[in-house]
């Protein structure tokens, strides 16, 4: 269910702000979004998996906090990321 190393590398390369950037809010939000999207497919098949659902809710909350942080720091970066990831807001 977790992202493979190749998938993570591709996401990091797409959203990083510099060559060595792996922890900026944009990268973290993109990784969380990919994990959330992957888990949603899991729940289509396993509706009663409440333990994993708890992890999903935790990821969604963490992404929400990071989005709020980014919005407070730089609205332009926030808007660009929302549009790039296709998140509704």
Swiss-Prot record:
Pfam short name (any one): Ribosomal_S15
A single GO molecular-function term is: rRNA binding
Q: Which UniProt keywords apply?
A: Ribonucleoprotein, Ribosomal protein, RNA-binding, rRNA-binding
- Per the record, which residues fall in region Disordered? 1-25
Lineage top rank: taxon: Bacteria
Q: Where is the composition biased (Basic and acidic residues)?
A: 1-18
Q: Which family does it belong to?
A: Belongs to the universal ribosomal protein uS15 family.
Subunit structure and binding partners: Part of the 30S ribosomal subunit. Forms a bridge to the 50S subunit in the 70S ribosome, contacting the 23S rRNA.
The name this protein goes by in its record: Small ribosomal subunit protein uS15
């Amino acid at each position: 269910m977790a992202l493979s190393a190749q998938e993570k590398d591709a996401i990091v390369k797409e959203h990083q702000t510099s060559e060595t950037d792996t922890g900026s809010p944009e990268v973290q939000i993109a990784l969380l979004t990919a994990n959330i999207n992957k888990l949603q497919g899991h729940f289509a098949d396993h509706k009663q998996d409440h333990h994993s659902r708890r992890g999903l809710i935790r990821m969604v909350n963490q992404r929400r906090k990071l989005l709020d942080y980014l919005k407070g720091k730089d609205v332009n970066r926030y808007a660009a990321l929302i549009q790039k990831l296709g998140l509704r807001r």
